[in-house]
Amino acid sequence: MSMLAAMMVLAGASGSTPAPDVLMRNYMTCAVSTREPQMRLLLDTKADEDYRAAALSVTDVDKCARSDAAVTAPLLAAFGPERGKFRGMVAETLLKRSTTVRKLAALPQVSSYTAGWFAFTGRPQAVDEMAMCVAATNPGGIITLLGTKPGSTWQRQALTALTPSLGACLAKGYQLDTKPAGLRAALAEALYHRDYYVSVPGRGS
């Protein structure tokens, strides 16, 4: 087993998804159903003011909020240290509504990957570059991953199966120390951007 595979197996053995993450995922599902354009803007924007406006627009979805924490959590997550995980949850929720993602073909790997949305994720650029590369070369592997329950044995197995793609796409010399939840989020967002920009003619990353 490679060092990368061993790291992911050990990191994924921590157990079930924490309750706050479950709450946030439920909120995202509800918010997307009522504010899909704003939720997409959170992922697509390349301007700070647009990002803030999009985050503010989903804090007042009253029927989605079951506590004060649920109301404020999206805004805090959109700008805090958990920004990357938050964006990944939004991406996963939007991908569930996609009619095209399963039609994406694996593409040959290219020498570099870059996109305007990297600046808003809060992740190391090398992680987003890797995720974008995997979304291009192995979209099916990410789809399998996103079909698993976060924190489950199935997720761990899906991540292990993705190890060759992750290794091939990771920048030489970069030490990947991202936890499974963060890795899942990065891959989900990268796949969302590939699917959305392929699905909407004239859009670019």
Residue ranges and their predicted role:
Residues 25-28, 36, 127-131, 139, ...:
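Extracytoplasmic/secreted envelope proteins and their assembly/folding machinery
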Residues 20-25, 32, 121-130, 135, ...:
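Short, low-complexity cationic-aromatic patches
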Residues 157-205:
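A cross-kingdom marker for long, charged
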Residues 86-151:
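Extended amphipathic alpha-helical interaction segments
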Residues 39-52, 142-156, 202:
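Short, tandemly repeated low-complexity microdomains enriched for cysteine and small residues
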Residues 14-98:
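N-terminal Sec/ER secretory leader and immediately downstream segment
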Residues 1-12:
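Sec-dependent N-terminal signal peptides
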